[in-house]
Amino acid sequence: MKKKLTGIVLLLLFFAMPLQGQAKVKAPKKQCHAYAVMDAGSGEVLFGQKANKKIYPASTAKLMTAIVCVEKGNVNSVIKTKSDVVYRTTPGTYSLGIGAGVNYTFKDLLHMSLMSSAADATDSLAVGVFGSKKACVEAMNEKCKELGLKKTHFDNPVGSDIGAGYNETYASAKEMAKICRYAMAIPLIRSAVSKAHYSTQKGGMYVNTTNWFLKGMAYYDRDTYKIIGSKSGTTNAAGHVFIATAADYEGHELICAYFGNVSKESTFASIRSLFDYAFNNYKKGKLTLTPSNYDVRSSQKYGAVYSEYSALHCYPAQKDGLFAPNKAITRKQL
């Protein structure tokens, strides 16, 4: 068997059998509208505060826009911006000033949307892929139905809400965590939200992230875990919001969907404390976390192949966390 394994570029991570049932821990109280902390491996909400309450997602809605655009569009295409889109962006939003009549790659617009939260880039991507913002929104709501989300609805691609006259964009912390979990299983989206800076391939734009963790403007315990990305936002109705994804060094990932703090500083500080609390309780044996390869969470493309590995608590992966099964290894050999 050693000969068969020689030269295979796999990282085999073996984990002990999980405990029977999930241990419960008390949810810390936070000054916010709602939050949910989810185990990304299993999709289970570990603890939260008013996690099913109606909230306004603000620009975290762009995660769903990104999902439907990546799944529908040609990610290697070039999109020419239109004046009636970039100069008439959805009200109550921030624009980067990408200009009209400029050719950007699909990936350029995606990065500007997710990293800097640019409404002009988001609307341009939506129109470039679907032909209209309305068609994009229809796809977003269809995706909500597909994912079984009953408390989430969108009426624009960028996350404008009741404060700007968009009354049909709303969600819950739990369901936005589910949307983030799905988005973070798509390699292109995962890559975009993990960057602090980005230079567009076309158009000459330089993009900075709004994620203070990635910019080094918000402290967290890097010896225990690493913040690997996701999306921020703010509106008057939503308050300051952020959905963060963190990974420890054993293959576990947590998602914290946090909505409605009074300031950006306190939002990031609260999320850090919730990640600290969750990972520390895991170390103490009070929480069970589920390791997994991120690209199979919301996909059935590997079918029984992945099940053969996960049944034995063996997770073959490349260094970036993608599932990389070795077909030469049988269940018996594992």
Where are these predicted regions, by residue range?
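Sec-dependent N-terminal signal peptides of Gram-positive bacterial secreted proteins and lipoproteins
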Residues: 3-22
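Active-site-adjacent loops and short helices of periplasmic peptidoglycan-processing enzymes
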Residues: 21-174, 183-184, 324
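Penicillin-recognizing serine hydrolase domain
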Residues: 27-32, 131-291
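Short, mixed-charge aromatic SLiMs
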Residues: 86-98, 200-206, 299, 328-330
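N-terminal propeptides
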Residues: 33-36, 107, 140-144, 289-333
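Residue-level recognition of short loop/turn positions
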Residues: 41-42, 250, 320, 333
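Active-site/binding-pocket entry motifs
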Residues: 85-87, 219-220, 280, 314-316
